[in-house]
Swiss-Prot record:
This is Visual system homeobox 1. GO terms for cellular component: nucleus. The gene is VSX1. Coiled coil: none annotated. A motif (Octapeptide motif) lies at residues 52-59. The lineage of its organism: Eukaryota, Metazoa, Chordata, Craniata, Vertebrata. Keywords: Developmental protein, DNA-binding, Homeobox, Nucleus, Sensory transduction, Transcription, Transcription regulation, Vision. Belongs to the paired homeobox family. Gene3D superfamilies: Homeodomain-like. GO terms for molecular function: DNA-binding transcription factor activity, RNA polymerase II-specific; transcription cis-regulatory region binding. Residues 27-47, 112-159, 271-350 are annotated as: Disordered. It is found in: Nucleus. Residues 27-36 have a biased composition (Low complexity).
Length: 350
């Protein structure tokens, strides 16, 4: 490529792509001739024709134009690289002729100066939303941490358990051996004996039956469990014991089809009989009191009748006498009118 003669009379060397040592540095006049051309461009718009100056030949002023429609990048980039190359050229020119200088390859291959552009970040609105969401998460986390102790306290609050004494357990076990399903009357009697509420006694029996069933299942007595379930249903729904089971127990409980059920039925019947026998003395004493009251009423009525008797008798007799006298008068008149011989004979006798 032919070079242009500069004022100093030297020729410029052809540029190579790799850094090379330049034997003769350009004079300051050539560098100054390039500067007005660079500053004459209005705002850097449009491309001018390349000259034959050392800066043009070495590509020191080569600037990459951004593609149309592309957003302008951050300040720096290749324009900064061009300015850097220009500064290097000036330094080489001032160093004087004959001083070797290493110049870089075409500057478009140089990396951009300044901070490397990272991946495109989210827009400011999205960033604000993200920050607000993180704040809300942190607030909710703090609130949940504050709420956790309350929930743990609520979970720790358990129902008050009834602590049974030895005497209460003894009475309850006795009642359980007599009947696994006590009725309301039996539970009330137990409540009086043990000084426990009736509902707590009912819950104790439920737990005791569950424990008994678990133990029987471990022993593998399935027939007893079936009888137990039947007995519970009978007690709940007031169903009488089937006659077939009662008839099968005539020879004894051992030969019956449901010995355990019959045993429990027998125990419950004994308990009910005991309760009836305890109620009978009270009923007899009340009957005696009622009889005594009736006798007293009868005696008082007799006394009142005796007091009124003498006053009534003369009146009754007077009424009767008046009636008989009237009847006699009527009969005498009739006899006189009729001329009855009997009346005449009576008059003669008189």
């Amino acid at each position: 490529m032919p070079g242009r003669a500069d004022p100093s009379g030297g020729r410029a060397a052809v540029p190579v792509p790799l850094p090379v040592a330049v034997a003769a540095a350009p004079s300051p006049a050539s560098v100054r001739s390039a500067l007005p051309e660079r500053s004459a461009r209005p705002g850097g718009a449009g491309l001018r024709a390349k000259g034959f100056a050392i800066t043009d030949l070495l590509g020191l002023e080569a600037e990459l134009q951004p593609p149309p429609g592309a957003a302008p990048g951050p300040a720096g980039g290749y324009e900064g690289g061009g300015a850097l190359g220009l500064g290097l050229g000036l330094l080489c020119g001032l160093a004087g002729p004959g001083a070797p200088c290493l110049l870089p390859a075409p500057l478009p291959l140089l990396p951009a100066r300044g901070p490397r552009p990272g991946p495109p970040g989210p827009p400011p609105a999205a960033r604000r939303h993200k920050e607000s969401a993180s704040d809300e998460d942190s607030l909710s986390g703090d609130a949940s941490e504050l709420k956790m102790p309350a929930s743990q306290i609520k979970r720790k609050k358990r129902r008050h358990r009834t602590v049974f004494t030895a005497h209460q357990l003894e009475e309850l076990e006795k009642a359980f051996n007599e009947a696994h399903y006590p009725d309301v009357y039996a539970r009330e009697m137990l409540a009086v004996k043990t000084e426990l509420p009736e509902d707590r006694i009912q819950v104790w029996f439920q737990n005791r039956r569950a424990k008994w069933r678990k133990r029987e299942k471990c022993w593998g007595r399935s027939s007893v469990m079936a009888e137990y379930g039947l007995y519970g249903a009978m007690v709940r729904h007031s169903i009488p014991l089937p006659e077939s089971i009662i008839n099968s127990a005539k020879s004894g409980l051992v030969g019956s089809c449901a010995p355990w059920l019959l045993g429990m039925h027998k125990k419950s019947m004994e308990v009910s009989r005991k309760a009836e026998s305890q109620e009978k003395p009270a009923d007899g004493w009340q009957a005696e009191q009622d009889g005594e009251e009736l006798q007293g009423k009868q005696a008082s009525s007799q006394r009142s009748s005796e007091k009124l008797g003498p006053a009534k008798d003369p009146e009754d007799t007077a009424i009767d006498l008046s009636r008989t006298a009237k009847q006699e008068k009527r009969s005498v008149l009739r006899q006189c009118v009729n001329g009855d011989p009997t009346t005449e004979q009576k008059d003669r006798d008189h």
